[in-house]
Amino acid sequence: MRLHKNLVLAVIKVLDGTFNQQLYADKTIEKVLKFDKRWGSRDRAFIAETSYEIIRWKRLYTEISESKSPFKYNELWKIFSVWAILKGITLPNWPEFNDTPNRRIKGKFDTLNKIRKFRESIPDWLDDIGASELGDKNWEKELSSLNKQASVLSLIHI
C-alpha cells in the first residue's frame, strides 16, 4: 500500500478533532470528507477505516509512540506511523517520518503485547473489573472475542 499525503493529513485532522478537541469521531470524519470532493470511495474508506482503527487502538499506539494527551501535531504523526509500521506499510520519505524508529516500534509492540490491558487496548479500570468478575481465563477469552471484527450478515425479507 502506498500512502498519499493528502489522505494521511485527513486522518491526522480526524485524530486531532477526536483526541484533542473531544469531538465525536463520526462527525469529525464526516466534516473532513467534505474537504475534498475529488476523493473517491477508496480514499474515503481509507480515511474512515484508518481513523477508526487508530482511535480503537489508541491506548496501545500512544504507549508505543510515547505520546501523552493532549497530543501535539508531531505526536499525531508518531501515532499514525506506529499504525502504519504495525500494518507493514512502508513509510514514505516525508519529513514527518524522518525520525521514526521502525525496529523500536516493533520491539515495543512485542513487549506490550504480553500485557493484557495494552494488547486489548482497554483502560485499567475495565481490565480490573473484568478480571475480578469473570476470572482471568474467561476475561481473556471475552476480550479477544470483543476485539474481532463482526462478520457481515444480510437478511432478505421475501
Language model: regions and residue ranges:
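Class I Rossmann-like S-adenosyl-L-methionine
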Residues: 1-156
